[in-house]
Design a protein with these regions (language model features):
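Charged, low-complexity, helix/coiled-coil-prone segments
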Residues: 6-16, 49-61, 72, 112-116
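Amphipathic alpha-helical interaction surfaces in cytosolic regulatory modules
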Residues: 22-101
Length: 119
């Protein structure tokens, strides 16, 4: 994974955490997106949780890459969930009606529970 991402596996769920507070640079977004798509396309991972805790801003390019990733995960019969969104970013998801597309959970624990993982 890129220096900007941290991944870990919890009982079959791949959790991706972001190191950057502001995800705005088009080149970085493209690189992160490609690496996350690789999790789906080459490693055949079907349960991916994106944890945005600590992320303060997402650009429109980041939203586009998330839509692309969500489609790829669904195409292989998987489920992508999102957690840890700041109120401002959650509001942007709602304004763009992306909350209708993505399964957004408040906490990582809530998301893992939705995958059937219990602590």
């Amino acid at each position: 994974m890129a220096e900007r991402l941290v991944t870990l596996n919890v009982n079959g769920v791949t959790i991706v955490r972001f190191k950057d507070k502001r995800i705005v640079d088009a080149g970085n977004i493209e690189q992160m997106g490609d690496e996350m798509l690789q999790l789906v396309n080459t490693q055949h991972l079907k349960q991916i949780l994106l944890n945005f805790e600590g992320v303060e801003f997402l650009s429109s390019a980041a939203f586009n890459k998330l839509i692309e990733l969500n489609k790829a995960v669904k195409d292989v019969g998987g489920v992508l969930r999102i957690t840890g969104l700041r109120a401002e970013i959650l509001e942007a998801f709602k304004m763009l009606r992306l909350n209708k597309i993505f399964d957004i959970r408040k906490t990582e624990a809530d998301s893992l529970k939705a995958y059937g993982v219990t602590n």
